[in-house]
Amino acid sequence: MPKYRSATTTHGRNMAGARALWRATGMTDADFGKPIIAVVNSFTQFVPGHVHLRDLGKLVAEQIEAAGGVAKEFNTIAVDDGIAMGHGGMLYSLPSRELIADSVEYMVNAHCADAMVCISNCDKITPGMLMASLRLNIPVIFVSGGPMEAGKTKLSDQIIKLDLVDAMIQGADPKVSDSQSAQVERSACPTCGSCSGMFTANSMNCLTEALGLSQPGNGSLLATHADRKQLFLNAGKRIVELTKRYYEQDDESALPRNIASKAAFENAMTLDIAMGGSTNTVLHLLAAAQEAEIDFTMSDIDKLSRKVPQLCKVAPSTQKYHMEDVHRAGGVIGILGELDRAGLLNRDVKNVLGLTLPQTLEQYDIIVTQDDAVKNMFRAGPAGIRTTQAFSQDCRWDTLDDDRSNGCIRSLEHAYSKDGGLAVLYGNFAENGCIVKTAGVDDSILKFTGPAKVYESQDDAVEAILGGKVVAGDVVVIRYEGPKGGPGMQEMLYPTSFLKSMGLGKACALITDGRFSGGTSGLSIGHVSPEAASGGSIGLIEDGDLIAIDIPNRGIQLQVSDAELAARREAQEARGDKAWTPKNRERQVSFALRAYASLATSADKGAVRDKSKLGG
């Protein structure tokens, strides 16, 4: 029988000092012996996805204590990728994932907490907490802050839906008037919550459902809706049950590594492909799998991407649907239900509620459930009122979207496409693979060949795009922006958005060893591995080289002979200390970022730290 970790600090005469300090936090004699559960919050006033979380930790803590546990809350950092985008701040986004994971480990292990409730929401916070949870392998439940309502405004006498990406595109489009740009900007992000499309934050919060580590509704129920409060209340109660199951009944099925098994990771990736999620999810699932010591690689993702259809299409791939529409159609469970009926899921998995996949679908899939309360929950909709307050409205859709032929979520027979929303490509400058969000690629450019325009930084590429130096037919190559080369693997949302602003969204391709925002669409290929800074062949591409992209056949090829590439590699190596570094790029890189870069691996490994460099 495992002993409560917290007993290390609460029992024994030699721990009198620790108990004295615990008493100073409000604990009493009656509390020593109860499980100490960390409430891992991420409230900050910097990030709309986290601005409403201040009081939610207390909400969870009250339920933990009512159920017989002791709750102790702490906070992690949270970077807003949208605010950090387009300048030096983006260098810090991906490294913050490791910092968050480490900080959770530090706090939980330093104070010997027995379990955790992770209150996350945005891009790197959910992955960082997920990595920490699987590293620590103590009972955990995730409950995120929830999605933002979609923005809405009236243009040309028509009400249209908006999100962050629309504001960016219109702001850079010279054909759009100042007044219209300002109107879109003021309407794009109306409430608290993670940005309203199937961007990285919402993709990851959906995937925690598929991994079994969060409750049904977690990924899609709006941040503003009163129904979301129940997820937080349930999490506080349920974590005490999970904790006691493990420590008092020796039930290892309560541990996250047994819930988020390889089968669950495969289900999560299947969901991601089917819903056209952010390419960043690939990076984060690979990283989380390594923390769980699960053999889950790019090869597994490639195999899944070849057999899973696209059953859901959401902004930025279309402006018709946002997360509020996904929820109305049954949320994550609705998509999983269709995947299960298509025979594409591993059914022998459980979630934090103790339910198997078939049991979860029977209770929560709107197509089959007989539970009116569940149907009512999925009718939770937007209010259209600007707010930063959680649970501030209780509006409901009149009906559910259960149309699997033409609705937001489709059945296998009516899939948006037989190929899924993500694909892995391989070729002579992406030997270890690269990723494209096929859900956002127009059918007319699934095969594309063009001359390379090579840039050693995102900044140079943006300047060229806005300066008219990139023309229809070009393949924009942005390199030395990988985990090591950036450092920090910047998102390329501005270059892709500006291509659209210049009318080139369907006329150019963009390839990078960096990554893309979940808000990116178009022929945008990222995560090229190995990255240039690690000696990857993307560092050998020259202006004018022809690059052929063949998404249907999963290929990407630099049309240069092997002999020429070998000669270029020899010339690169001859640069000595300057080999595999960008030419003529001035970038101030802090010590903290240099430390990150010194251990960073390429994207095909999840951009995690190279343990071999530390002898582990």
Curated annotation (Swiss-Prot):
What pathway is it annotated to?
Answer: Amino-acid biosynthesis; L-isoleucine biosynthesis; L-isoleucine from 2-oxobutanoate: step 3/4; Amino-acid biosynthesis; L-valine biosynthesis; L-valine from pyruvate: step 3/4
Cofactors demanded by this protein:
[2Fe-2S] cluster; Mg(2+)
The enzyme class is lyase
* GO cellular component terms listed in the entry, alphabetical order: cytosol
One Gene Ontology MF term: dihydroxy-acid dehydratase activity
Where along the chain is [2Fe-2S] cluster bound?
Answer: 122, 195
Free-text comment on the cofactor: Binds 1 [2Fe-2S] cluster per subunit. This cluster acts as a Lewis acid cofactor.
Tell me which residues this entry annotates as catalytic. 517
Q: What is this protein called?
A: Dihydroxy-acid dehydratase
